[in-house]
Structures are given as C-alpha cells and as structure tokens.
C-alpha cells in the first residue's frame, strides 16, 4: 500500500486528489464485500484499495479530513449496512451500535481529526434510527503507522492497544457492534480492537471501507 501511496503523491498532489474526489459519486466505486479470517475473527471490507478512485478517496479522507470523502464513505457504508441491519433485526433481538476504531491522542493531535469519526458523523445523518457512538473503545497505547510494517510487526504493534470504556463495559450482552475502520491490510487493527468486545461477550462485525 505504501508504494501505491508514493506513486499517488507524484501523480495526484493532494489538492488535485481532493478535486478528483469531489467529482466522484458512489457509482464510481465497485462495492464487492470481501471477508477474510484473522485467527477466530472474520473481517469484512467493501472496496479494493488497488482501485485508483479508492486510493484517492482514502488518502483524501485520512490526510485532509475531507467532508466529501467522509460523505462518500458513509454512503457506501449505508448501502451495505441497511441490508445487514435489516436482516439482523429480523432474525434476532440484537441491538445495533456502530462505532469506529479510536485514534491515538498523539495521532489525533497531529491530524486534528479522526477520519473514521468523520465517516460516522455523516453516517448518522443517513441512519438516524441506529445508535452511533465513539465512546465504546479507547486506545491505550500509541502505535506506529502500520503502512511500513511487516505482517508480524503489524500484529505486534497493535496487540493490546485497545480497551473498553465504562460505557463499553456496560453494553448489554444482546448488543451487536459494527466496528468501522477506513482501510485494512492484514486485519490487525480491527482484530485487536474487536477483542475487548468479544471477550466481554459482545458480538462484533469488524468492517473496513477498503482492503489492500
């Protein structure tokens, strides 16, 4: 993914990339849900990071905090989650909460925002009947950026990096948490962010916008 990013920085400087994203619609993305397993956890992604439009979307969101990018990601999620949640509500008594992978304090200070929180803010406008909260998980240690690390290093980097908040610990056992991240590669972040919930008896759907 880092090679893609370096190439994109040459071909699409940030300002040009942001302009390109502003011209995109949901129809410009091929949504193809893909699920893979990491240990005992199934992780789902919706887009391939190999797609140029997806690369522009994620980088504009991640490094510019683009409202347009966040809104596009939210719309892509809405189309997928509407069906998933409807099926869940029909077949079970689960109560759905959508949350995001928390960003470390240092990283958030550097960027000035949490990109997945921006997505959830837009998603709440589209799914107002579903509870959306960023008060379920906290990141308990600062971690290195994952992009330059090997698979083993990625897993070690985020191991035990997340804990439940007081609110998270109090979730009823019939809660179904949809845990959102922007992009996943080996699934390490979503896996370790899910663990405090699953260890507390909560069912989780770890879900990334893109995989690559």
Regions found by a protein language model. Give the residues of each.
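Glycine-rich phosphate/pyrophosphate-handling loop used in enzymes and phosphotransfer proteins
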Residues: 1-212
């Amino acid at each position: 993914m880092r090679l893609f990013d370096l190439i994109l920085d040459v071909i699409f400087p940030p300002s040009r990339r942001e302009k390109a994203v502003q011209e995109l619609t949901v129809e410009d993305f091929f949504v193809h849900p893909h699920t893979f397993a990491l240990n005992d956890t199934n992780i789902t992604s919706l887009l391939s990071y190999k797609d140029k439009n997806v690369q522009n979307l994620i980088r504009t969101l991640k490094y510019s905090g683009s409202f347009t990018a966040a809104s596009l990601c939210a719309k892509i999620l809405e189309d997928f989650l509407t069906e998933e949640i409807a099926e869940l509500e029909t077949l079970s008594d689960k109560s759905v909460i959508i949350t995001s992978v928390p960003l470390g304090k240092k990283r958030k200070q550097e960027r000035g925002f949490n990109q997945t929180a921006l997505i959830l803010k837009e998603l709440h406008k589209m799914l107002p009947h579903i509870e959306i909260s960023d008060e379920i998980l906290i990141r308990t240690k600062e971690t290195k950026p994952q992009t330059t690390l090997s698979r083993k290093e990625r897993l070690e980097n985020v191991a035990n990096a997340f804990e439940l908040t007081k609110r998270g610990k109090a979730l009823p056992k019939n809660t179904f948490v949809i845990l959102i991240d922007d992009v996943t590669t080996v699934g390490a972040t979503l896996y370790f962010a899910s663990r405090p919930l699953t260890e507390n008896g909560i069912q989780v759907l770890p879900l990334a916008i893109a995989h690559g």
